[in-house]
C-alpha cells in the first residue's frame, strides 16, 4: 500500500473530480463527484476549494441573468480564478499531496520543497517512471482501488475542453506513450541507422557483360602514336617547342632558349614531330606552312605579317583566301579574318586609310575633289576603274565661223591661185555654193559671239586644250552628220575659218582626219608664232 501511495506521488494524476453546488440556482450545473488527490487519506471537496475566498456564488447568481452565456466564457472564468490560487490549493487541485497545516505552523512558512515530489521536464525520466508504474500496476491486484473512476459524466460538460486536458491528462499519458512505442517499433531499422553499403558483397557482377563483349571492338579506328618521350632528349624537345611557338624557323645560334623563358607544351607540334620521324627541321618546315597545327589562341602578329596583310588587302580587298595564299602564308584564313576586325579598330588602320587616300588623290584631276569613301568598299581594280568611270567632262566641238577676209591664198581672174599671200577681196559668185547654211546650236552660237581670243582661251578648272585652225575646201562640209542641217539657204556663204578645240584626240576617228589631209594643195608657207604650244594656231591651206 505504501508503494502504491509513493507511485501516486511520483506520477500524480487526477482520476475524478467532485463539483458540488457550484451554482445552487442552476440545477444543470449541480454534480457530485469524489476526488482522490494523490493520497487515499485526504479527500477534498472541490466546491469548497473553489468557493473559498473567490466568491463563486456571486458568479453563479449572475448566471440566471445571462441564460445564454456560453460554456467557453465559463471556462475562461475558471481559468482566471485558478490563476490566482495559492500554491498549496493549486497543488491539491491537480492531484499533488498538500502539506499538513500542523507542519506549516511548525515550520512557520518554511520550505515546502521536501514535501513536493521530484518534478522534472526530462522526457526520458518521465517515460521511465510511467513504464515502471505500469509494471507495478500489472503485478498488484489492488491498483484499481487507488484510481477510482469518475461516477458522473456531467462534470465533463462543465469543463468542456479544459477538464479533458487537465484532469484526465494522467489517464491518457500512459496510453499515448504506449501507442508511440508501438509506432516506433513498427519503423524499419534502416530509417534510424542507415548502413553504408560498401564492400564486395554490394558490387554488381559484370563478368557476363565482359564475356559477351570480349570479341567486339571498342572502336574501328586504329591506334596512333601521338608522342614518345624516350626518343629525343628533353633539352632538344624544349628547343623545338620554343622555335615552333615563337615562329623562329631558322637555326638559332648561341644559347638556344633565353634564360628564364617558359616553354609551353603543344600537343599538335609534338604530334607533327612524331609524324616527321623526330626530324626537327622537317617538322618546323611543315609547321611553317601549316599554322593551324600550332595555333594557340590569337598569337601576336609580327611586323612583317602585318605589312604583308595590308599589302594583300590593298591588292585583293576582302578576299582573305587570296591574302592568305599569296601574302600571309604563316596564318590561316580564320586568323586573317580575326586580325582584320581587330586591325580596323587600331591606329594602324587609320594610318593605312590616310596613306591610301593620299595615293588616290595623285591620280584624280585637279578640278575634282576626292570624296570620303570607306575602304571596305574598295576592290582590287578600284583605282583603275575610278578614272574610267569618272572621266573628264567632254565638251562639244566648238566651231567658230567668221565671214569676211580669210588668211588663205587669193584667186586671180584667170581662176589660178595667186602667189601672193594675204587677204583678198571677196568675190561674189554667180551660183550659191554647194555648202548649205549651218544652223548653230545654242552652245555654238554663244561661243560665236565671243571674240576669237576669248573663244580660244582655256576655261579655268579644265585641262589645257590645243586649238587647231583649219582652212577647209569648198566641197567639204563643216560638220558631221549628227548636227541638224537646214535645207533652205537664206544667203550664200563662203568658206570660213574653223577653230577646232579638241580635249581628247581619241574622239576623232581616222576617217574624219583623212579628208582634211587628202585632195588639198600643200601649204606654201607656214606661220610660226612665239606663243606657247597650248595657245599656238596651226595654219593649213
Swiss-Prot record:
Region (Disordered): 100-119, 131-186, 364-440
Subcellular location: Nucleus
GO cellular component: cytoplasm; nucleus; protein-containing complex
Segment forming the signal sequence: none
Keywords linked to the UniProt accession: DNA-binding, Nucleus, Phosphoprotein, Repressor, Transcription, Transcription regulation
Domain SANT stretches: 296-348
Pfam family, one: ELM2
InterPro entries for this protein: ELM2_dom (IPR000949), Homeodomain-like_sf (IPR009057), MIER/MTA (IPR040138), SANT/Myb (IPR001005), SANT_dom (IPR017884)
Principal location listed in the UniProt entry: nucleus
Domain ELM2, chain residue ranges per copy: 194-291
Subunit text: Part of a complex containing at least CDYL, MIER1, MIER2, HDAC1 and HDAC2.
Function: Transcriptional repressor.
Protein name, entry field: Mesoderm induction early response protein 2
Species per Swiss-Prot/TrEMBL record: Mus musculus
Amino acid at each position: 500500500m505504501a508503494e502504491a501511495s509513493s507511485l501516486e506521488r511520483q506520477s500524480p494524476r487526477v482520476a475524478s473530480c467532485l463539483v458540488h453546488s457550484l451554482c445552487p440556482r442552476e440545477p444543470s450545473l449541480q454534480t457530485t463527484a469524489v476526488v482522490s488527490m494523490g493520497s487515499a487519506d485526504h479527500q477534498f471537496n472541490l466546491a469548497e476549494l473553489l468557493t473559498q475566498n473567490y466568491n463563486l456564488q456571486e458568479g453563479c447568481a449572475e448566471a440566471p441573468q445571462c441564460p445564454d452565456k456560453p460554456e467557453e466564457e465559463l471556462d475562461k472564468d475558471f481559468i482566471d480564478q485558478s490563476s490566482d490560487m495559492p500554491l498549496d490549493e493549486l497543488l491539491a487541485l491537480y492531484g499533488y499531496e498538500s502539506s499538513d497545516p500542523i507542519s506549516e505552523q511548525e515550520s512557520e512558512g518554511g520550505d515546502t520543497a521536501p514535501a513536493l515530489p521530484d518534478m522534472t521536464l526530462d522526457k526520458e525520466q518521465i517515460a521511465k517512471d510511467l513504464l515502471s508504474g505500469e509494471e507495478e500496476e500489472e503485478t498488484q491486484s489492488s491498483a484499481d482501488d487507488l484510481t477510482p473512476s469518475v461516477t458522473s459524466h456531467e462534470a465533463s460538460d462543465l469543463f468542456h475542453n479544459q477538464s479533458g486536458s487537465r484532469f484526465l491528462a494522467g489517464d491518457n499519458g500512459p496510453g499515448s506513450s504506449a501507442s508511440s512505442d508501438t509506432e516506433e517499433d513498427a519503423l524499419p531499422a534502416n530509417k534510424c541507422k542507415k548502413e553504408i553499403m560498401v564492400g564486395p558483397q554490394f558490387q554488381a557482377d559484370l563478368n557476363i557483360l565482359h564475356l559477351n563483349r570480349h570479341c567486339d571492338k571498342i572502336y574501328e579506328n586504329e591506334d596512333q602514336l601521338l608522342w614518345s618521350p624516350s626518343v629525343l632528349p628533353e633539352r632538344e624537345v624544349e628547343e623545338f617547342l620554343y622555335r615552333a611557338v615563337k615562329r623562329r624557323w631558322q637555326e638559332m645560334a648561341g644559347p638556344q632558349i633565353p634564360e628564364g623563358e617558359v616553354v609551353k607544351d603543344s600537343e599538335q607540334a609534338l604530334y607533327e614531330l612524331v609524324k616527321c620521324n623526330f626530324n626537327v627541321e622537317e617538322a618546323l618546315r611543315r609547321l611553317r606552312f601549316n599554322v593551324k597545327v600550332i595555333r594557340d589562341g590569337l598569337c601576336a602578329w609580327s611586323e612583317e605579317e602585318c605589312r604583308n596583310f595590308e599589302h594583300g588587302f590593298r591588292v585583293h580587298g576582302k578576299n582573305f583566301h587570296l591574302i592568305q595564299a599569296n601574302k600571309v602564308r604563316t596564318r590561316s584564313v580564320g586568323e586573317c579574318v580575326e586580325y582584320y576586325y581587330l586591325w580596323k579598330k587600331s591606329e594602324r588602320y587609320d594610318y593605312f586609310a590616310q596613306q591610301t587616300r593620299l595615293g588616290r588623290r595623285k591620280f584624280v584631276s585637279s578640278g575634282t575633289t576626292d570624296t570620303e569613301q570607306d575602304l571596305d568598299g574598295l576592290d582590287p581594280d578600284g583605282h583603275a576603274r575610278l578614272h574610267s568611270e569618272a572621266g573628264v567632262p567632254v565638251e562639244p566641238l566648238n566651231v567658230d565661223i567668221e565671214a569676211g577676209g580669210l588668211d588663205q591664198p587669193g584667186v586671180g581672174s584667170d581662176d589660178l591661185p595667186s602667189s601672193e599671200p594675204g587677204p583678198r577681196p571677196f568675190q561674189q559668185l554667180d551660183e550659191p555654193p554647194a555648202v548649205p547654211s549651218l544652223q548653230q546650236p545654242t552652245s555654238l552660237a554663244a561661243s560665236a559671239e565671243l571674240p576669237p581670243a576669248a573663244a580660244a582661251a582655256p576655261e579655268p578648272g579644265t585641262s589645257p586644250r590645243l586649238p587647231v585652225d583649219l582652212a577647209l575646201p569648198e566641197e567639204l562640209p563643216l560638220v558631221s552628220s549628227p548636227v541638224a542641217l537646214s535645207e533652205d539657204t537664206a544667203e550664200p556663204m563662203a568658206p570660213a575659218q574653223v577653230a577646232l578645240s579638241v580635249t581628247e584626240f581619241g574622239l576623232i576617228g581616222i576617217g574624219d582626219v583623212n579628208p582634211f589631209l587628202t585632195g588639198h594643195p600643200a601649204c606654201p608657207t607656214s606661220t610660226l608664232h612665239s606663243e606657247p604650244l597650248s595657245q599656238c594656231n596651226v595654219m593649213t591651206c
